[in-house]
């Protein structure tokens, strides 16, 4: 019965409608395939300790079913539709196979129904192959478990010792797992001294020098590279903190160059407001500057009253020799050349420093008292009122000399006071 049904199936479906458990169709003729199936059936029976199913093995369905039997021997967890009991003796299994094929045979007995039954048999074989393949792929063998555990142990073991972390854990294991578990490298003082020395000379190492230092310090190249990266970041951080500190409390070291600029700005505004230069000026010079501002306010009105004096911005170069030959000869041409504040008489209104000595008030050379200074300022203002346009050269002399005096005369003031 079994042989006839199997041979009828093979003749009806032409020997190529069935698919093996691996999902490929078999186009070979039936006799050659019978031999291979016979060999496989014998091997699988010997492997699974099956009883003999007969001398002639059925061609293709038996091949698929023996594959299923092989899978059931490896792992007896197939779906209940093909194997209702989990572990079945082979004769019952062959009876089930024959019964399923016999039920498919009447459907294909008609002339046109062969294709339909072939489709159903294909679907059944496909379902059987799909049922066997997931069980085969889902099965986890012990060597797979061992290899995964070994790799995990390899990844976690370098964290125990720093030497392994330097060699294998840092380079071979993935960075995400190793970075969190890698031990902190402890550098000796000698290594740190050498690294700091090298960093002092050049902050970026070339690779030959890095290899040389690695051999010299018994460190890995990776450690030296990472140390230099961290050291550069620390250096940048220190530079930023220094920059912030110098900008906040910084006018003390860096303020000496800007002070002349501030003073020049104050001198430019001195014709309009008295308080502009008082702030940057040192407290010891407050008296002379206040006196000078008194003079500036005294001169301000005659300037407004005398229209020809509006040319004073252009006239100082013409009257520079006269001013240098004037009463303050000790602040001569070197001072004028040495002061960058004076540029072509642009800061003509910067007059407030030691105006009395500039104007021939040599009886007040040392600014002995505020009253005398103010008297001198009023005297000069009176003179300026009498002839506002004529003594214009002397006024330009004062304005031309002052930028140099405001910077250089501070030391003589200290000695005189």
UniProtKB/Swiss-Prot annotation:
Keywords: Developmental protein, DNA-binding, Homeobox, Nucleus, Transcription, Transcription regulation. InterPro entries: DUF4074 (IPR025281), HD (IPR001356), HD_metazoa (IPR020479), Homeobox_Antennapedia_CS (IPR001827), Homeobox_CS (IPR017970), Homeodomain-like_sf (IPR009057). Gene3D superfamilies: Homeodomain-like (1.10.10.60). One of its GO terms (cellular component) is nucleus. Residues 51-135, 147-184, 237-290, 381-417 are annotated as: Disordered. The keyword DNA-binding applies. Pfam families: DUF4074, Homeodomain. A motif (Antp-type hexapeptide) lies at residues 140-145. Residues 120-129, 154-180, 243-253 have a biased composition (Low complexity). It comes from the Eukaryota. Residues 107-119 have a biased composition (Gly residues). One of its GO terms (biological process) is regulation of transcription by RNA polymerase II. GO terms for molecular function: DNA-binding transcription factor activity, RNA polymerase II-specific; RNA polymerase II cis-regulatory region sequence-specific DNA binding. Its main location: nucleus. Residues 180-239 bind DNA. Residues 93-106, 261-273 have a biased composition (Polar residues). It is found in: Nucleus. Sequence-specific transcription factor which is part of a developmental regulatory system that provides cells with specific positional identities on the anterior-posterior axis. Belongs to the Antp homeobox family. This is Homeobox protein Hox-B3a. The lineage of its organism: Eukaryota, Metazoa, Chordata, Craniata, Vertebrata. The gene is hoxb3a.
